[in-house]
């Protein structure tokens, strides 16, 4: 399973990359705004900075919602760096755009997936990735992890090549559950990845080892 970090914060991206387990990065307009990155020129320059840090795919989202606009914007984004993946919303015009990009060798991430039917459409159009939003489904008392199971089953049935990129992942347990469900990729904040390191028995065991070592060396 691949780990992507879901942020536009360069310091956090660097920290994630330094762990040695980072495979990519996802961003969206909200994350860019959170970092105070405004204006197309500044946003696109920021994408380039992210690509300099991350040795892997970087999702950059189109703002346009019409077919022509998405094509124009997506083509320009793809030219920024070889690792750019054009992120396209799950709407009718978006699926058409994904098909075009797929036919022309441009990687895509179909975002805002909330149902198995949407996942089928994304795969049929040739999306490189699709992003089911786990946490947002949980927020409305639906089952985000179950959606991953459903998509995995469908994709395995028909040998679809689209990678399941679990998004809206809120914590370390979500990551593990996504892995169990067969997600190809999990994208999440840095603190969720870091949360995987910790277990009270690991801390207790290490403390005991160090205490025993110190005691033995005092003799």
Describe each model-derived feature in a short phrase.
Residues 20-24, 80-84, 100-109, 124-131, ...:
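Glycine-enriched alpha-helix->loop->beta-strand junction motifs that scaffold or abut catalytic
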Residues 29-33, 112, 128-140, 183-202:
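Glycine-rich phosphate-binding active-site loops on the catalytic face of alpha/beta enzymes
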Residues 155-219:
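C-terminal alpha-helical cap/extension of soluble enzyme domains
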Residues 11-19, 69-73, 97, 115-125, ...:
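Catalytic cores of alpha/beta
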Residues 28, 86, 122, 151, ...:
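Conserved, mostly hydrophobic/aromatic
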Residues 44-58, 95-108, 144-164, 207-219:
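Alpha-helix-loop-beta-strand connector modules within alpha/beta enzyme cores
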Residues 3-5, 9-13, 19-21, 27-100, ...:
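Active-site beta->alpha loop and helix N-cap motifs at the rims of alpha/beta catalytic domains
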Residues 111-165:
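A contiguous pocket-lining binding segment that forms or flanks enzyme active sites
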């Amino acid at each position: 399973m691949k780990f992507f970090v879901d942020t536009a914060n360069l310091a956090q991206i660097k920290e994630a990359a330094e762990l040695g387990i980072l495979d990519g990065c996802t961003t969206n307009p909200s994350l860019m705004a959170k970092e105070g990155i405004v204006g197309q020129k500044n946003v696109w320059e920021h994408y380039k900075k992210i690509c300099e840090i991350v040795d892997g795919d970087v999702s950059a989202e189109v703002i346009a919602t019409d077919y022509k606009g998405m094509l124009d914007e997506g083509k320009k984004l793809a030219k920024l760096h070889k690792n750019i993946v054009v992120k396209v919303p799950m709407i009718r015009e978006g699926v058409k755009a994904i098909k075009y990009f797929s036919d022309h060798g441009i990687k895509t991430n179909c975002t805002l997936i909330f149902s198995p039917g949407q996942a089928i459409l994304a795969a049929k159009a040739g999306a490189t990735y699709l992003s089911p939003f786990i946490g947002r489904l949980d927020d409305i008392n639906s089952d985000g992890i179950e959606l991953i199971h459903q998509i995995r089953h469908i994709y395995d049935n028909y040998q679809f090549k689209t990678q399941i990129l679990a998004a809206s992942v809120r914590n370390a347990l979500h990551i593990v559950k996504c892995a169990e469900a067969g997600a190809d990729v999990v994208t999440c904040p840095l603190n969720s990845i870091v949360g995987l390191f910790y277990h009270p028995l690991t801390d207790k065991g290490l403390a005991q080892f160090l205490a025993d070592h110190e005691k033995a060396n005092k003799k």
